[in-house]
Each structure stands twice: as structure tokens, then as C-alpha cells.
């Protein structure tokens, strides 16, 4: 399945049905009175999170979504039928923005969450609604109210417990394939990973979701390489696993390049808990490993863990460190205050990517 994490769509809720002007006409009933029914309400446009989706690719092929109009009122006090709602299905972690791409309308963090993005128009009153003691034969009815229409942006941010970051070719995809059942593309050249990958990791009887993010290079925040657009997928992570290639020229400089790009992203990624690991230790000599470890320790201001995705050396220790941090770190939640009238209230406990 192709990966798409951003899409622009047009939505329109249904118009309300018109009210009806009608009078009761029966034999032997001279003054039957008004009996025009009301129009039906237009359908809503609803966005819902469903299981089994991790891309917005469906919205590349269809960008226009319109709910059904309400039925018109009829005589004999028959009201128009309400229009059918239309439901847009999105993955958990999707954010809805206004057309300006800056105004956040809703942030989906739970499975089965529903949000009414456009309400259908109300149906118009038929003339039976206007009858009174002073107006026994009203000859007017209301038209239905128009529905709402707008362009919106859907932006998906994967929800994972831990995120893999590092320079291209640092061994992130190999590490993910070793610790989970994920099968990312692996090759000996930079930018093998072109879009984020998710894997479920099991360690010491516990499970967590690990996200592999495409590699960052110097100047990524300015659009160099693949840019930093994929960093949004680690905003919700509770911990970052920073892999540094032991075979690179200078492990300390490689570490600082990625940290500078995380800081330039301006979404507090540098404030997240970080575990630093020196990868590919099987490909260097003991002397080189000692030198690279010292460089990385000075740059990261912490003792890096040593790991090899090829031989598996150090992998259990890294996973154990990740699970310990994940169990203690708080779940990232949206800071939007109380739920609006268009959304369902959140559960009392934090959401996890592995919860049902």
C-alpha cells in the first residue's frame, strides 16, 4: 500500500429540505386547514478513526465528499426524510486543519473517535407549522437551510511509543527488522527508507510500537534531502532512540547534526527522553569503537549503548531500556482543553497504540 500522510479534501454537508404548502382536501370537509409537512434535515459530514489504516492514500483518488440533502415536505403532514450522513475514515493520529493549514480543527488520538466536521442544514417548516388562531390558512413555508462547505487538510501523524532517528544509512531499518516483524526496505545506500515504518516490539513480556523515520541530513529543516516533514510522526512518541553509525567519520558530529535538525523543527522534540546507541559495532575495530564511543559520549553528554543490528549484540539491552522509559513516560495527549460539542469525550486513561 502506498504511503500518503497529507491530503486536501472538499466537504459539503447536505442542504435541508424545503417545507411544503398544502391544504387538506376531503369530501364534506370544507375548511380542511393546512397540512404541509416540514423538510428533512441534511446529512452531516463525519470523520471517524478506524482500525487497519496507516495511510491517507484513498484521498488522493477522491477529494470531494458531499452528504445527502434532506427530503422536501409533502402534503398530509408528511415530513421529508433526513439526508444520509457521509463518513470519512481515517487512521488514528490524523489531524484536521482548516484550509489555511494552520488552524487545528480536531486531533484524533483514539480508535473509533468520531467528529462532525460539517453539520447538515435544518429542514424548512411547512405551512402547517404556522397555523394559529389568527392565521388559519397560512400560505407560506420555509426553505431548507443550506449545508456547510469547506476545504480541509488531513494530516496523519503516526502514533508510536518510540521513534527511531538518525542520519541516513545509520542502520535504523535493519534494527527495526530485527526487533519486530516489520519488513522495511534495507540496502547499503542512503535514503533507503522513503516513508515511516511501524513495528510492534516485544521485550520482557511487554509490547510497544516503534516507528522508523526516514534519515535526516544537515539542512533538512530547509528542505534538503527528504526534508523534515516526517518528523511529525515522532511528535507523539514518548522516547527517541537515536542510532549513530559507528563506521561514520565522526560519531559526535553525526549526533549533533540530527540534534540540530530536531531543534529546528520547533515542536519540542529535543525535550523528549533520548536513548543514544552506537550502531554497527561489528563493522569497526576495538580501537575505532573506543574512539567513536568517547566522541559520542562527549557530544550526547551520556554514555551511549553499543548495539549491532546484524549480529544482535546489545539489542536486548536497548529494548529493555526503551520499555523502562516507555512505562514511566507520560502518554502524549493533545492540549486542546475540554472536548468540543462535535467530538466524543476522551476515555479516562491514556491511549496506547496497542490498546483495543
From Swiss-Prot:
Q: Where is the Obg domain?
A: 1-159
Where the record annotates domain OBG-type G, the positions are 160-327
Give the protein's cofactors. Answer: Mg(2+)
Task: Tell me the Gene3D superfamilies matching this sequence.
Answer: GTP1/OBG domain, P-loop containing nucleotide triphosphate hydrolases
Q: Which GO terms describe its cellular component?
A: cytoplasm
Where in the cell is the protein located? Cytoplasm
* Keyword Nucleotide-binding part of the UniProt annotation: yes
Q: From which domain of life does this come? A: Bacteria
Q: How does it assemble?
A: Monomer.
Function comment: An essential GTPase which binds GTP, GDP and possibly (p)ppGpp with moderate affinity, with high nucleotide exchange rates and a fairly low GTP hydrolysis rate. Plays a role in control of the cell cycle, stress response, ribosome biogenesis and in those bacteria that undergo differentiation, in morphogenesis control.
What name is this protein filed under?
Answer: GTPase Obg
Q: Which organism is it from?
A: Afipia carboxidovorans (strain ATCC 49405 / DSM 1227 / KCTC 32145 / OM5) (Oligotropha carboxidovorans)
Gene symbol? obg
Amino acid at each position: 500500500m502506498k504511503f500518503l500522510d497529507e491530503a486536501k479534501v472538499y466537504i459539503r454537508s447536505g442542504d435541508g429540505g424545503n417545507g411544503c404548502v398544502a391544504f387538506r382536501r376531503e369530501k364534506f370537509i370544507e375548511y380542511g386547514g393546512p397540512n404541509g409537512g416540514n423538510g428533512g434535515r441534511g446529512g452531516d459530514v463525519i470523520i471517524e478513526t478506524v482500525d487497519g489504516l496507516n495511510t491517507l492514500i484513498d484521498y488522493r483518488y477522491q477529494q470531494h465528499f458531499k452528504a445527502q440533502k434532506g427530503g422536501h415536505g409533502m402534503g398530509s403532514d408528511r415530513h421529508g426524510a433526513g439526508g444520509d450522513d457521509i463518513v470519512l475514515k481515517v487512521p488514528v493520529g490524523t489531524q484536521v486543519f482548516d484550509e489555511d493549514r494552520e488552524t487545528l480543527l480536531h486531533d484524533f488520538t483514539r480508535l473509533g473517535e468520531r467528529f462532525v466536521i460539517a453539520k447538515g442544514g435544518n429542514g424548512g417548516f411547512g405551512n402547517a407549522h404556522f397555523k394559529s388562531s389568527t392565521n388559519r390558512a397560512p400560505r407560506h413555508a420555509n426553505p431548507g437551510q443550506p449545508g456547510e462547505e469547506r476545504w480541509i487538510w488531513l494530516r496523519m501523524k503516526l502514533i508510536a511509543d518510540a521513534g527511531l532517528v538518525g542520519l541516513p544509512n545509520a542502520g535504523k531499518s535493519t534494527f527495526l527488522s530485527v526487533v519486530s516483524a516489520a519488513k522495511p526496505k534495507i540496502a547499503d545506500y542512503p535514503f533507503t527508507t522513503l516513508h515511516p515504518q511501524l513495528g510492534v516490539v516485544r521485550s520482557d513480556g511487554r509490547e510497544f510500537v516503534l516507528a522508523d523515520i526516514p534519515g535526516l541530513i544537515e539542512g533538512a529543516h530547509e528542505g534538503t534531502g527528504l526534508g523534515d516533514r516526517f518528523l511529525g510522526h515522532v511528535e507523539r512518541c514518548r522516547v527517541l532512540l537515536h542510532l549513530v553509525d559507528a563506521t561514520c567519520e565522526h560519531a559526535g558530529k553525526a549526533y549533533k547534526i540530527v540534534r540540530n535538525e530536531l531543534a529546528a523543527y520547533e515542536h519540542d522534540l529535543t525535550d523528549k527522553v533520548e536513548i543514544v546507541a552506537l550502531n554497527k559495532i561489528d563493522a569497526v575495530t576495538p580501537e575505532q569503537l573506543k574512539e567513536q564511543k568517547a566522541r559520542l559520549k562527549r557530544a550526547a553528554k551520556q554514555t551511549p549503548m553499543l548495539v549491532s543490528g546484524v549480529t544482535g549484540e546489545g539489542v536486548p539491552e536497548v529494548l529493555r531500556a526503551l520499555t523502562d522509559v516507555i512505562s514511566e513516560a507520560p502518554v502524549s495527549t493533545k492540549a486542546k482543553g475540554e472536548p468540543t460539542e462535535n467530538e466524543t469525550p476522551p476515555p479516562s486513561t491514556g491511549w496506547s497504540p496497542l490498546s483495543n
